């Protein structure tokens, strides 16, 4: 799943229905995400609409290096924080609570980015040959030693070492230059 990137490419090529598809797929989730910052559903909807408008007006800003969903959530977060900063209504929230909200926002952004990275890595792992998939799973997900993985796979330690080396190399190729950061 590309989280809207292919639809956005179709939109850039002139397919207006592709943008509607993006809106249907991502709008509600973006509103919910923004509402977590502003605690006002109507304002969150307005900010989400502005975020999608920004995508149309400033087409060159999205560079396909992250998923479209991640990009929209980053822009939405930024707009939500701007809204909070410039809101004319003075909240009776304590300053310490405001810092906690900002810390939660940063943590939430990290979670969204981490989820996107996990999906990319899991998708790349699924493309590996079976032996490589198994060794990656045993070593990194099951946290087995090379010796334990070798026993499970009925291979010797050197074979496991070689398989893991080739698997990492293949993952870097599949993930592209961003793979260096993910692995």
Regions found by a protein language model. Name each.
Residues 24, 31, 41-58:
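Conserved RNAP core-binding helix
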Residues 25-28, 36-39, 137-144:
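Short helix-capping/turn signature of helix-turn-helix
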Residues 90-114:
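Internal acidic/polar
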């Amino acid at each position: 799943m590309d989280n809207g990137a292919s639809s956005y490419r179709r939109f850039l090529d002139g397919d207006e229905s592709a943008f509607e598809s993006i809106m249907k797929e991502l709008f509600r989730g973006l509103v919910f995400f923004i509402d977590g910052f502003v605690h006002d559903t109507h304002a969150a909807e307005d900010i989400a609409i502005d975020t999608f408008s920004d995508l149309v007006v400033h087409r060159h800003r999205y560079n396909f290096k992250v998923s479209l969903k991640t990009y929209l959530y980053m822009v939405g977060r930024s707009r939500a924080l701007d809204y909070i900063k410039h809101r004319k209504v003075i909240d009776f929230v304590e300053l310490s609570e405001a810092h906690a909200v900002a810390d939660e926002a940063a943590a939430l952004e990290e979670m969204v980015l981490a989820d996107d990275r996990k999906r990319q890595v899991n998708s790349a792992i699924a493309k590996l040959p079976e032996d490589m998939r198994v060794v990656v799973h045993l070593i990194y997900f099951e946290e087995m030693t090379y010796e334990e993985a070798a026993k499970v796979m009925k291979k010797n330690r050197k074979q496991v070492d070689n398989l893991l080396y080739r698997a990492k190399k293949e993952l870097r190729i599949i993930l592209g230059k961003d793979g260096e950061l993910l692995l």
